[in-house]
């Protein structure tokens, strides 16, 4: 059966940890008939949290995809859902999911409001221009305040909130919502897991508030819709429900507004209305219309329209290792269709790959399908060479889509196999795990020869080591966590490197003149500009020179830390018709970079974390003093509805190892903290080198 893309939705559910993402997804699966029993996070039965570590810890670690159908307005909508982690250590899962999704449901706790990871997820959605709706969850909890959370979304996230519902009751008395558009009350039946609800007239005590927010709603959408504006000023009664719904959808897709609704997923209230809102307001693939890419042959921009008649194109956004089927590549199809058993082109590698099997995923279960079409999300096996961010396409119509960018790891750990006989098994495990997770990096320390694994936080690496033991049967000894510093250039230098070697017979010769300078602010990697003229360096050697410079950036001139932002202008050079070859120019580039970098007054960069502490007022002084002693900079202090203090600060990661234990001591166990990576900043002198020689 062919897709009707008008009725397809590709959405993600994202939020801070413990806001109720997985609980919400489990309710969606129940109400749409995928599951016949509600899975719960707290008892380890959630379908989407299928990893043993997720079930044991009660948190989501990896993004999980599924598919369901929902009847809305007499049409069956197909909804592809990706449930994402809320812990900052696993933000890579959110990043790569949002890259391929058309819409997002952002969950907020009605008690805790906008939390640190809420802000991170919001920035990621802004980066990829993902339309979203907000769902204020946990309306049944003590301290729930729907309107306060809406204000936080406005002030902290800069969102133009459009309130579509008013809660009926609060905390233990939360019963349902008033739909502002239809001016009806929706009350859920608690006896049958919320599968049925009643439509009633609005309670009299909420009529005035409903009219107030309905006027605000119409005024807001009229700012972006001239038809609504005209009716609003001439005769507001002419504005129909369909007019309002259509206008809200248009403004949501244009990122002008964020519709806000509310409920309690755990108490089975509000989820069906959220599914209606997904169908009503979030875009279908044809609402997005097209995706732009680059033709690798012509290097010109090309467009793929989102329909099955276009040439096939897709983006691989996740690689996973499955014990039964092997390497599994998740991908979003933007155009055309793919049949199992056919060949496609990997634009990065230039290789043709045969797709042996295609699956629709339901958490960790694979449902085989023969064909997958534009607008769908699926997975496939058969790839010999596949990486996250690869574009897959019809070999006759090559295209490269924008890749997925990931944050750099900030924490490292030295490991070795517990038993020498396991060294090969450890290497295999590390290779497969780093293939899955672009923020998990494996390297050998050039000073000590140790294997260093790097990731986004202590929990991230803890999960990696746990998976090595469970899935690959490898036990390791580990050192203490260490900060992943970086090096940076501060000055420009023009440098000439001549590599010459004579050993009798054919020798080696390469001559390059280049300018090395700091990269543009906010950029990553190497910006390479070739200005060589007149064939002084044969053009076939230029790619090798660029590749060698990139390789050289992995080892900075001070202590061997990576330089991740530089600009190189290749100015001139010379070659020998007999002695010059690709290797000669690669060696000249690597040696030249190292020699030039030493003269740019390089500095050390350290990772800075955004720290947020929630504490009783009486412990605030001790905690602020301790943060100051850790080279922290206080960014602000707030008070929440329970009169607890929220301390926000920027603190170097090197000062935060073991901070949870320290905080517990300072507050007698009453304070809690969260942290997330902020940015790399110059480390002030003196720089103490730990575990370096």
Swiss-Prot record:
Keywords: Cytoplasm, Elongation factor, GTP-binding, Nucleotide-binding, Protein biosynthesis. Coiled coil: none annotated. GO terms for cellular component: cytoplasm. InterPro entries: EFG_II (IPR041095), EFG_III (IPR009022), EFG_III/V (IPR035647), EFG_IV (IPR047872), EFG_V (IPR035649), EFG_V-like (IPR000640), EFTu-like_2 (IPR004161), G_TR_CS (IPR031157). CDD domains: EF-G, EFG_III, EFG_mtEFG1_IV, EFG_mtEFG_C, EFG_mtEFG_II. Residues 6-286 form the tr-type G domain. GO terms for molecular function: GTP binding; GTPase activity; translation elongation factor activity. It comes from the Bacteria. PROSITE patterns: G_TR_1, G_TR_2. One of its GO terms (biological process) is ribosome disassembly. It is found in: Cytoplasm. GTP binds at residues 15-22, 83-87, 137-140. SUPFAM superfamilies: EF-G C-terminal domain-like (SSF54980), P-loop containing nucleoside triphosphate hydrolases (SSF52540), Ribosomal protein S5 domain 2-like (SSF54211), Translation proteins (SSF50447). The keyword Protein biosynthesis applies. PANTHER family: RIBOSOME-RELEASING FACTOR 2, MITOCHONDRIAL, TRANSLATION ELONGATION FACTOR G-RELATED. Belongs to the TRAFAC class translation factor GTPase superfamily. Classic translation factor GTPase family. EF-G/EF-2 subfamily. Catalyzes the GTP-dependent ribosomal translocation step during translation elongation. During this step, the ribosome changes from the pre-translocational (PRE) to the post-translocational (POST) state as the newly formed A-site-bound peptidyl-tRNA and P-site-bound deacylated tRNA move to the P and E sites, respectively. Catalyzes the coordinated movement of the two tRNA molecules, the mRNA and conformational changes in the ribosome. This is Elongation factor G. The gene is fusA.
């Amino acid at each position: 059966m062919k897709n009707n893309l008008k009725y397809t939705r590709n959405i993600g559910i994202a939020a801070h940890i413990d806001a109720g993402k997985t609980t919400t997804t489990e309710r969606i699966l129940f109400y749409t008939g995928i599951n016949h029993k509600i899975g719960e996070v707290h008892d380890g039965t959630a379908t989407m949290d299928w990893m043993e570590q997720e079930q044991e810890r009660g948190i989501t670690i990896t993004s999980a995809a599924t598919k369901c159908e929902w009847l809305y307005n007499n049409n069956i909508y197909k909804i592809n859902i990706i449930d994402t982690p809320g812990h900052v250590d696993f933000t890579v899962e959110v990043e790569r999911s949002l890259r391929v999704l058309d819409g997002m449901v952002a969950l907020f706790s009605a008690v805790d409001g906008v939390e640190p990871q809420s802000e991170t997820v919001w920035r990621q959605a802004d980066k990829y221009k993902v339309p979203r709706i907000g769902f204020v969850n946990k309306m049944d909890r003590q301290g729930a305040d729907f309107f306060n959370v809406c204000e936080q979304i406005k002030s902290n996230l800069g969102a133009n909130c459009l309130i579509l519902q008013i809660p009926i009751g609060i905390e233990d008395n939360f019963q349902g919502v008033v739909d502002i558009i239809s001016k009806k009350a929706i009350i859920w039946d608690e006896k049958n897991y919320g599968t049925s609800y009643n439509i009633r007239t609005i309670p009299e005590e909420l009529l005035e508030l409903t009219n107030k927010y309905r006027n605000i709603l119409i005024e807001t959408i009229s700012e972006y819709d001239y038809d609504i504006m005209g009716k609003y000023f001439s005769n507001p009664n002419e504005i129909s429900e369909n007019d309002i719904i259509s206008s809200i959808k248009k403004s949501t897709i244009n990122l002008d507004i964020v519709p806000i609704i509310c409920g309690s997923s755990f108490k089975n209230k509000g989820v069906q209305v959220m599914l209606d809102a997904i169908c009503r307001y979030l875009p279908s693939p044809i609402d997005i219309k097209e995706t732009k890419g680059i033709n690798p042959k012509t290097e010109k921009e090309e467009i793929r329209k989102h329909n099955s008649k276009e040439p096939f194109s897709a983006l691989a956004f996740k690689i996973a290792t499955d014990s039964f089927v092997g390497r599994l590549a998740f991908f979003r199809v933007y155009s055309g269709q793919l049949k199992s058993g056919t060949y496609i082109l990997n634009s990065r590698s230039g290789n043709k790959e045969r797709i042996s099997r295609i699956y629709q995923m339901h958490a960790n279960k694979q449902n085989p399908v023969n064909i997958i079409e534009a607008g769908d999300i699926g997975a496939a096996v058969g790839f010999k060479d596949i990486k996250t961010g690869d574009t897959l396409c019809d070999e006759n119509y090559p295209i490269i889509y924008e890749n997925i960018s990931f944050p750099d790891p900030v924490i490292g750990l030295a490991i070795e196999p517990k038993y020498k006989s396991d060294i090969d098994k450890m290497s295999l495990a590390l290779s497969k795990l780093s293939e899955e997770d672009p923020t998990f990096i494996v390297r050998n320390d050039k000073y000590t020869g140790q294997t260093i694994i790097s990731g986004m936080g202590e929990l991230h690496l803890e999960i990696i080591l746990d998976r090595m033991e469970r899935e690959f049967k490898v036990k390791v000894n580990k050192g203490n966590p260490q900060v992943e510093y970086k090096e940076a250039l501060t000055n420009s230098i023009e440098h000439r490197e001549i590599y010459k070697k004579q050993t009798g017979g054919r020798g080696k010769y390469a001559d390059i003149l280049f300018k090395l300078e700091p990269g543009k602010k906010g950029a990553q990697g190497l910006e390479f500009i070739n200005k060589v003229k007149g064939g002084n360096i044969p053009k076939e050697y230029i790619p090798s020179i660029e590749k060698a410079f990139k390789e050289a950036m992995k080892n900075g001139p001070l202590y061997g830390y990576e330089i991740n932002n530089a600009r190189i202008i290749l100015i001139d050079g010379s070659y020998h018709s007999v002695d010059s070859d690709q290797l000669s120019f690669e060696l000249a580039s690597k040696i030249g970079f190292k020699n030039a970098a030493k003269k740019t007054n390089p500095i050390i960069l350290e990772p800075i974390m955004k720290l947020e502490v929630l504490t009783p007022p009486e412990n605030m002084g001790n905690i602020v003093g301790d943060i100051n002693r850790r080279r922290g900079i206080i960014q602000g202090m707030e008070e929440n509805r329970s009169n607890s203090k929220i301390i926000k600060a920027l603190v170097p990661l090197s000062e935060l190892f073991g901070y949870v234990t320290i905080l517990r001591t300072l507050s007698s166990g009453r304070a809690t903290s969260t942290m997330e990576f902020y940015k790399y900043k110059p480390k002030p002198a003196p720089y103490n080198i730990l575990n370096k020689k």
